[in-house]
Curated annotation (Swiss-Prot):
The UniProt record lists the keyword Ubl conjugation: no
Signal peptide: none
Gene source species: Vibrio campbellii (strain ATCC BAA-1116)
The protein, known as: ATP-dependent RNA helicase RhlB
The keyword ATP-binding is annotated on this UniProt entry: yes
Reaction catalyzed: ATP + H2O = ADP + phosphate + H(+)
Encoding gene (name): rhlB
Length: 437
């Protein structure tokens, strides 16, 4: 393992409960990442923390390890019923909640503690049945957690550990009132272990920590640069007319093992999906309108390698832990500078390298200057040869049409339908202009 990603701190030397160490070792976790090495020694003394770390740094394992260990070392409240959670982990999106639950699986197995999910978009009754079976750790989104609370499925009187993940995103999505509602129904901050993690410790996030935590210690892991030194960035200036052909030509040239294509609107994502699906790619669509069960299935297929391309809005840009994403395509430059960082942060994770390709088109080139100012460097620019772009593209599929997803077929078909890689070279690299000081 590379020392740039893994420290010399061993989990086995932290004084964790044997059941916790066993769960970590079974998943191959021996050495801590920087955020784990900084946060865990503090948390294991019972001290609250407010941690700043980008996604992909191992913060999920940090707070899961601390939560499970705390529950094993702290006696539960006298008279607690099995349906009353002892710990609560709040996430901004259901996808992130599900991912946290999945990441907790080895610790659930090794410790015997019970975890349950609560998030919108899935059957209330199914989640209710799981909760009624008993729960030690409740993982979910604030809206559904409040629904269960108001229906008196559980109370929060026995909470001994609290995690607020992606706190800055919670603010962005307008969940701060829900968070405060839940905090005010828990025991006093000094009576529980509190963990807050955020990509940025902005003033509003620090204010939340001050209000609902007990003298939290600030733990900061700054990336060497906002976009990650293992991510190769590249920028094109296509016309609106050339964008789709350029995307498909670059996909053919790059031949990514696993790639995410981001666009700014649901309708644009559907259009991109239609073009790629018609061309025979195994492609999934992830937007806010896709039903929850479908979203989960698509993410599972993408993670297992059954889908090679994922077209998504920014709903998938934060918090999801999808391994081995080799490429990110920004079909549209995002309106929010932080979204650019979070999008391309889907690749180049856990010490791996990645490639980010962005289009500064007629509609969204205006977003480039603030993005480059935010990331503190100019994105290298490549020209392209319009005559080298793919021309023989089929008509796009419509959303009502069946999704054949035939990028790789059992009959030995190629990854892009009947067209084999042609070795096109649309790029004409050029030096980016020096940034004005």
């Amino acid at each position: 393992m590379k020392k740039t990603h893994i420290t010399e701190q061993k989990f086995a030397d932290l004084g964790l409960k044997p059941q916790v160490t066993e769960g970590l070792e079974k998943k191959g976790f021996e050495y801590c990442t920087p955020i784990q090495a900084l946060a865990l020694p503090v948390l294991l003394t019972g001290q609250d923390i407010a941690g700043q770390a980008q996604t992909g740094t191992g913060k999920t394992l940090a707070f899961l390890t601390a939560t499970f260990n705390h529950l094993l070392t702290t006696p539960e409240h006298e008279g607690r019923k099995p349906t009353q959670p002892r710990a609560i982990i709040m996430a901004p999106t259901r996808e992130l909640a599900i991912q946290i639950f999945n990441d907790a699986a080895p610790l659930i197995a090794s410790t015997g503690l019970k975890a349950a999910l609560a998030y919108g978009g899935e059957s209330y009754d199914k989640q209710l049945a799981k909760l009624q079976d008993g729960v030690d750790i409740l993982i979910g989104t604030t809206g559904r957690i409040i629904d269960f609370y108001k229906q008196r499925v559980f109370n929060l009187n026995n909470i001994q550990a609290v995690v607020l993940d992606e706190a800055d995103r919670m603010f962005d999505l307008g969940f701060i009132k829900d968070i405060r509602f839940l905090f005010r129904r828990m025991p006093e901050p000094k009576e529980r272990l509190n963990m807050l993690f955020s990509a940025t410790l902005s003033y509003r996030v620090q204010e939340l920590a001050f209000e609902h935590m007990h003298n939290p210690e600030h733990v900061v892991v700054e990336p060497e640069q906002k976009t990650g030194h293992r991510i190769q960035e590249e920028l094109f200036y296509p016309s609106n007319e050339d964008k789709m052909a350029l995307l498909q030509t670059l996909i053919e040239e790059e031949w990514p093992d696993r790639a995410i294509v981001f666009a700014n609107t649901k309708h644009k994502c559907e259009s991109i999906w239609g073009h790629l699906a018609a061309d025979g790619h195994r492609v999934g669509l992830l937007t806010g309108d896709v039903p929850q069960k479908k979203r989960e299935k698509i993410l599972e297929q993408f993670t297992r390698g059954e889908v090679d391309l994922l077209v998504a809005t920014d709903v998938a840009a934060r918090g999801l832990h999808i391994p081995q994403v080799t490429h990110v395509f920004n079909f549209d430059l995002p309106d929010d500078c932080e979204d650019y960082v979070h999008r391309i942060g889907r690749t180049g994770r856990a010490g791996a390298s990645g490639h980010s390709i962005s289009f500064a088109c007629e509609d969204y080139a205006i977003n480039l200057p603030p993005i480059e100012e935010y990331i503190e460097h100019a994105i290298p620019v490549s020209d392209y040869d319009a005559s080298a772009l793919i021309q023989d593209l089929p008509a796009p599929l419509r959303m009502r049409a069946p999704r054949t997803q035939q990028r790789r077929t059992n009959t030995g078909g190629t990854r892009s339908g009947n067209r084999k890689p042609q070795g096109r070279r649309p790029r004409q690299p050029r030096q980016s202009a020096p940034k004005q000081s």
